[in-house]
Amino acid sequence: MKLTPEQILEIFNFRHACKKFDGRPLHEAEWNTILEAGRLSPSSFGYEPWHFVVVQKRELLEKLYPWTWGGQRTLYNASHLLIILARCQRDLQPDSQYLGHMMRDVLGLTPELCQAREERYATWQERDFDLTQERPVFDWACKQSYIALANMMTVAASLGVDSCPIEGFKRTEVERILQEEGILEPQHFGVAVMATFGYRAEAPHRPKTRQSLGEITTWVR
């Protein structure tokens, strides 16, 4: 079904950073659709440098709570906490095992095309974007993860599900907890961003505010 422009804008106006959920669990079909939106999201070179961690276990939420100051109003009343992990430099080197798996097993490239893709990626990484150090490579992977998160929040809104993106957390402590829980392998992943999902307990306290299109758009014709 094709949505009208008005329906699309209605979805975007519905979405807001929900600070209070009503505690109801999401329907399984809704949550699976939101996850699928993340899975089907685009990524540079098609390398999908992310992993989605879905947290509902109360004990883990309690461990994360002191270090997630930006989500303390929603951690306990949301239906799901999503933690998106981003790949580290080790997995994003042109000749890494992970990228080899992606090219062969996921993208289905022939050995010849894998070699050509590896060379093109290496040239782009080194000469175009200067991604030769650990932190810039991880930050690039985080940027890819935000594409997936944006799609997940938009699809959630289209289903009448609310969300709240969270960057307010102590990364080192959250990664330590996830490592202790056997969820995160620090040689492969770091935490990119979090978000909570559920049903709003109350309407937004004020209307959505944004700059006008004229302020943020330059036309070159």
Predicted regions and their residues:
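Acidic, surface-exposed loops and disordered segments
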Residues: 1-221
